[in-house]
UniProtKB/Swiss-Prot annotation:
Function as written in the Swiss-Prot or TrEMBL entry: Quinone reductase that provides resistance to thiol-specific stress caused by electrophilic quinones. Also exhibits azoreductase activity. Catalyzes the reductive cleavage of the azo bond in aromatic azo compounds to the corresponding amines.
Cofactor: FMN
Catalytic activity: 2 a quinone + NADH + H(+) = 2 a 1,4-benzosemiquinone + NAD(+); N,N-dimethyl-1,4-phenylenediamine + anthranilate + 2 NAD(+) = 2-(4-dimethylaminophenyl)diazenylbenzoate + 2 NADH + 2 H(+)
Taxonomic lineage from the root: Bacteria, Pseudomonadati, Pseudomonadota, Gammaproteobacteria, Enterobacterales
Enzyme Commission number(s): 1.6.5.-, 1.7.1.17
Family membership noted in the UniProt record: Belongs to the azoreductase type 1 family.
InterPro entries reported in the protein's UniProt record: Flavodoxin_fold, Flavoprotein-like_sf, FMN-dep_NADH:Q_OxRdtase_AzoR1, NADH:quinone_OxRdtase_FMN_depd
Textual note on the cofactor: Binds 1 FMN per subunit.
Organism, as annotated: Escherichia coli O139:H28 (strain E24377A / ETEC)
Keywords attached to this entry: Flavoprotein, FMN, NAD, Oxidoreductase
One GO MF term attached to the UniProt entry: electron transfer activity
Matches recorded under PANTHER family: FMN-DEPENDENT NADH-AZOREDUCTASE 1 (PTHR43741), FMN-DEPENDENT NADH:QUINONE OXIDOREDUCTASE (PTHR43741:SF2)
Name of the protein described by the UniProt record: FMN-dependent NADH:quinone oxidoreductase
Subunit structure: Homodimer.
Amino acid sequence: MSKVLVLKSSILAGYSQSNQLSDYFVEQWREKHSADEITVRDLAANPIPVLDGELVGALRPSDAPLTPRQQEALALSDELIAELKAHDVIVIAAPMYNFNISTQLKNYFDLVARAGVTFRYTENGPEGLVTGKKAIVITSRGGIHKDGPTDLVTPYLSTFLGFIGITDVKFVFAEGIAYGPEMAAKAQSDAKAAIDSIVAA
């Protein structure tokens, strides 16, 4: 039995293409892997606090006493990291906003990227500590950006996930959704076909 963690990060709730596709992924996965456990965390509905000068002090090893706000941030960081490490498959619904990921997803990453916990520095360079996972990124875009200089989502997510130890990453693209109903429907259809292929593998 595998455990699947789905991270939603769109601000558009039910209107979101990435949310709809991640819901489709969950439906297909449950159909093919009925014994697996699926956890869904909606980072827009339940936002992660923005990392600031006070909160960053809670995430670094220190003997200094923590403020109540820092204690809350550290407890949330511990919870998010434990959840991440407890799952085998990580599904990230990542819409493109202004060429990059959403603020909601970036805030999540800022709380799970912790030296000595999810990665460490060695004499040979950084080493990821979140290993043995597979990641599937479902990314929706209004325009066409794949393999072009305006796609900052794909390299960023590949780099971040690899940095913490997740190197088996597959991408599902839904592009051109702002080009009209016909293009949006094709984007959804192509993305669902890619999801079907991943789920069946």
